[in-house]
Amino acid sequence: MLRTTVSKLARPTVSRAFATTSRALAGETGAPPKTGGPGDAFQRREKANEDFAIRQREKEKLLELKKKLAEQQKHLKTLSDHIDEITREQGGERN
């Protein structure tokens, strides 16, 4: 018994270093895994809301473009009709 006590005292004491795991530091409940998992319900809902807002803006832009396209086509039609009217007044095309 005395020998084991002396041998334990003769060994230098090794103190453990303070360490934390990344899992413990990633956050409390609800933090997504670092592997790119789906996340918690709040994050999924937030992403869905952002995606919806983006789709709405894109839809509005698309409707604006369609409206401008219709206006341009109407303008081209009036110009084409005007050209046809002028050529009829001058006696048509003579080739």
Swiss-Prot record:
Transit peptide range per the UniProt entry: 1-25
Q: What is this protein called?
A: F(1)-ATPase inhibitor IF(1), mitochondrial
Main localization (coarse):
mitochondrion
Question: What family is it from?
Answer: Belongs to the ATPase inhibitor family.
**Subunit relationships:** Associates with the mitochondrial small ribosomal subunit (mt-SSU). IF(1) coiled-coil forms a helical bundle with the C-terminal extension of uS17m and also binds to mS27 in the mtSSU tail. Since the C-terminal extension of uS17m stabilizing the IF(1) on the mt-SSU is specific to N.crassa, IF(1) binding might also be specific.
Residues covered by region (Disordered): 20-48, 76-95
The UniProt entry's GO CC annotations, sorted and at most eight, read: mitochondrion
Note on domains (UniProt):
The inhibitory N-terminal region (residues 23-59) is entrapped between the C-terminal domains of the alpha(ADP-bound)-beta(ADP-bound) (atp1-atp2) subunits in one of the 3 catalytic interfaces of F(1)F(0)-ATPase.
Name the domain of life this protein comes from.
Eukaryota
Where does this polypeptide localize?
Mitochondrion
Q: Which GO terms describe its molecular function?
A: ATPase inhibitor activity
Q: Fetch the Pfam families from UniProt.
A: IATP
Sorted alphabetically, the keyword list is: Mitochondrion, Transit peptide
InterPro entries membership: ATPase_inhibitor_mt
What does it do? Answer: Endogenous F(1)F(0)-ATPase inhibitor limiting ATP depletion when the mitochondrial membrane potential falls below a threshold and the F(1)F(0)-ATP synthase starts hydrolyzing ATP to pump protons out of the mitochondrial matrix. Required to avoid the consumption of cellular ATP when the F(1)F(0)-ATP synthase enzyme acts as an ATP hydrolase. Functions through inserting its N-terminal part into the catalytically active F1-ATPase, thereby blocking its rotational movement and subsequently the ATP hydrolase activity.
